[in-house]
């Protein structure tokens, strides 16, 4: 047995058995593409578990993270974006990140990079429409950026995110208070100011953050619901703030 990432992989004696048991949907052509992209000359089944202590576990760890652990459609969707971006066009992924590939310049292989970006753009559009509905292109982009910035603050600056969340709840409890949320400014990272009595917040972040973050996931969908639930005549008079 092989233990990786605090998970015991049962009956895994080689990379080949790992593919057949832990990576559903991976067949021979996919394995050959990996071997070609990462320039592995030896077959995967030659690396046994007993030799993995001396062998670099990066390759196996890479597969274990990107492939889903079951046949759930949500895990499969999460893996599709990785397979489309790395497996199908590893060179394009390197060029997109501004990194050289096999000694080439970053400006080369433009056609494959263009095709890869088209596939990724269509994939993102489909996912955004599933989350936010059939909104226009600009609204989709704004919603996606607002959700991303809100999640970024929650994951990296949780104390500031919680302070903004408490400030929002405190403001909404007041009577005759209209809470304005500027989605355009939030999508550009212009988040305003915190209260001067904020504790545990640096001066730099006080100038960047107010009640524009601190929301639950999907807050933009609820915020835009009123805009797209009215008639066309009234909709023309409304605008995102």
Curated annotation (Swiss-Prot):
Gene Ontology biological process terms from the UniProt entry: translation
Keywords assigned by UniProt, alphabetized: Mitochondrion, Ribonucleoprotein, Ribosomal protein
GO molecular function, one term: structural constituent of ribosome
Highest taxon listed in the record's lineage: Eukaryota
Gene Ontology cellular component annotations, sorted alphabetically: mitochondrion; ribonucleoprotein complex; ribosome
UniProt main location, coarse: mitochondrion
Keyword Ribosomal protein included in the entry's annotation: yes
Compartment(s): Mitochondrion
Assigned protein family: Belongs to the universal ribosomal protein uS13 family.
Protein name per UniProt: Small ribosomal subunit protein uS13m
């Amino acid at each position: 047995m092989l233990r990786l990432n605090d998970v015991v992989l049962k009956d895994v004696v080689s990379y080949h058995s790992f593919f057949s048991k832990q990576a559903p949907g991976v067949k021979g052509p996919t394995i050959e593409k990996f071997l070609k992209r990462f320039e592995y000359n030896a077959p995967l089944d030659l690396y046994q578990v007993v030799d993995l202590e001396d062998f670099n576990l990066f390759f196996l760890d890479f597969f274990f993270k990107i492939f889903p652990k079951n046949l759930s459609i949500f895990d499969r969707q999460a893996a599709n974006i990785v397979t489309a971006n790395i497996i199908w066009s590893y060179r394009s992924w390197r060029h997109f990140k501004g990194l050289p590939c096999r000694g080439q310049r970053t400006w080369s292989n433009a056609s494959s990079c263009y095709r890869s970006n088209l596939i990724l753009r269509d994939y993102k559009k489909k996912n955004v429409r599933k989350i936010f509905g059939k909104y226009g292109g600009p609204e989709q982009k704004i919603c996606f950026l607002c959700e991303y910035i809100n999640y970024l603050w929650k994951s990296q600056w949780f104390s500031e995110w919680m302070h903004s969340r408490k400030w929002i709840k405190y403001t909404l409890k007041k009577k005759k208070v209209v809470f304005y949320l500027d989605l355009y400014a939030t999508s550009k990272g212009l988040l305003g100011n915190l209260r001067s009595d904020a504790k545990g917040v640096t001066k730099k972040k006080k100038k960047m953050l107010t009640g524009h973050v601190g929301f639950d996931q999907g807050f933009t969908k609820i915020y835009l619901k009123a805009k797209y639930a009215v008639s066309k005549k009234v909709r023309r008079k409304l605008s995102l703030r």
